Swiss-Prot record:
Lineage: Bacteria, Bacillati, Bacillota, Bacilli, Bacillales
Class of enzymatic activity (EC top level): oxidoreductase
Top-rank lineage group of the source organism: Bacteria
Protein name as it appears in the record: Ferredoxin--NADP reductase 2
InterPro entries: FAD/NAD-bd_sf, FAD/NAD-binding_dom, Fd--NADP_Rdtase_type_2, Ferredoxin-NADP_redctase_2
Amino acid sequence: MREDTKVYDITIIGGGPVGLFTAFYGGMRQASVKIIESLPQLGGQLSALYPEKYIYDVAGFPKIRAQELVDNLKEQMAKFDQTVCLEQAVESVEKQADGIFKLVTNKEIHYSKTVIITAGNGAFQPRKLELESAAQFENANLHYFIDDLNQFAGKRVAVLGGGDSAVDWALMLEPIAKEVSIIHRRDKFRAHEHSVENLRNSKVNVLTPFVPTELIGSERIEQIVIEEVKGERKEIIDVDDVIVNFGFVSSLGPIKNWGLEIEKNSIVVKSTMETNIEGFYAAGDICTYEGKVKLIASGFGEAPTAVNNAKAYMDPKARVQPLHSTSMFENK
């Protein structure tokens, strides 16, 4: 296993939006920063799950596409020369006798004076379509993740699911695809009422209460057989692509074994964002405290708190309260 013997000031576990802003802010405090991310790209769930969706609750943006927000955060972080390690899952974190943290991933050993974990809800995997033939089409036209809506231009698309993601994808695909069908096992959708109303008023073909029972095709899915729940109706739908939105299963995985105080699958932190382990901080959806609200906007506020207190932990003479950013960049 490779070993990076350089001891960084701050190592961030998780390269989602909060992790990216944490890395930028670490640069603001002149800290050497490393990000370790398990996915092949930065951006976390924004990039992996809904890059094309709009976000409406980030201060200063009436609306912003998820991937655009990630790109902006990456550009912001690029003001500093931060080290990024992709496709590395952190398996263990140990605070050594000398106070330095040793982080072991599936590929490499890292060392750091402090650690800030911004891993969202932990590792996440999509709930799969439980049909015998589903797996064979995953590299063809059965999708759990969507990178680019334009790949469905002029196509017949079936969306499976009844939550916010399923309804949102169906509505976004309507003006692009040739035909969109949404298939849900209940008559009532779990999505926000406004989205469901928009769905009912759209040209999307709503099929409820139906479940898929068979995928027909050789190398690609050509048709879906659906059957009515507690009924006798059966239909066959011609498709070019199938999008599965049954939600995701998230897990803290090995994080539970790192000696951190865990409460309801979240890491307990103090007002300084420090965990029960001195020098180990958390920010974003991964952490909890009294009154915690799990929003990207909240995580953006927690990141500077974690970094500034990590800086003071490393150097007790350092100010927790930083200079204003305008005074730091106006001459650069």
